[in-house]
């Protein structure tokens, strides 16, 4: 079910509900989000603060980009030599952008770090796929506060790790900091694979890695599922099927 992916700043995938890879008939918890702030940390506890804004490009130059979000707010970011343009797994140039396209700008309290998830007529495409680590690539835990175009807001707990057990409405992961985190899930829990395709909690397997967005311990979204490492690569025997069905506390 799952596809091997490179974990980049994948929170942005979740924020970009308009992605052409996503099933438009299924709305995830970030559908309609225009702004989000991640208060995150890496496995050593170092803080990572990331902001995402999504909207239509209404002004663009070599030195700045302005988005008009769906809540009618305009946000402007400086563009530097370090600003990266990414779309559908490939890197592009600033000259590949134009006003009228919809994009997500990733920032960290300053200039645009990444411009990505670009949609609309003439959106850049066709370049070779390449790996890329965005600002939140090393984040394994934290919170994401999302603002929606209608003025409402929601907060989500964020964790990233590999599944240790899943079944009977409960799922436990192990993060890179060796901390175990347990969740509950229900029929409304959304699973999206790396390409945005809809999956099912029933298809999740022990050893698979993903990002987990929850509220009050209840999983709302499992994102960018990727395969468990092979026993040969890890030097460890593969978890047994019974482990996946083991109840968790």
Label the predicted regions.
Residues 80-87, 186-193:
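Structured surface patches comprising rigid loops and adjacent beta-strands/short helices at the edges
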Residues 2-76, 88-182, 194-249:
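Short, flexible, surface-exposed loop segments at domain boundaries
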